[in-house]
């Protein structure tokens, strides 16, 4: 899937539509587990790199997660520009990374343990 190249101020409609985009140090992607179908997919919006997810939509549980950790001025602006304007569940950045990488199961299952 090709990412739309947009300006940061045009990010919100892409986020609300769950469309991948690339802006200036603000971008999104669909993440899914290898060898699984789209039921395990997550739509992740990042500021700068994968170490700072701002918002995550988890398809499996139909929930938006929001990074509740402290960040700088530019990342704060990225968050405002990409906010989906819907109910979100706030998480610490470490938990956001777990959800981005493993879905909500990353919050409840230790790494290496599968159901």
Task: Report residues per predicted region.
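Terminal leader/tail segments of proteins
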Residues: 1-115
């Amino acid at each position: 899937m090709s990412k739309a190249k947009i300006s940061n101020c045009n990010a919100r409609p892409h986020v609300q539509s769950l469309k991948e985009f690339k802006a200036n140090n603000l971008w999104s992607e669909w993440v899914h587990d290898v060898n699984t179908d789209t039921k395990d997919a997550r739509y992740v919006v990042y500021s700068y790199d994968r170490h700072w997810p701002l918002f995550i939509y988890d398809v499996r549980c139909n929930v938006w997660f929001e990074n509740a950790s402290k960040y700088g001025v530019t990342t704060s602006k990225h968050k405002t520009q990409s906010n989906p304007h819907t109910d979100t569940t706030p998480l610490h950045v470490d938990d956001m990374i777990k959800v981005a990488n493993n879905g909500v199961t990353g919050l409840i299952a230790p790494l290496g343990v599968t159901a």
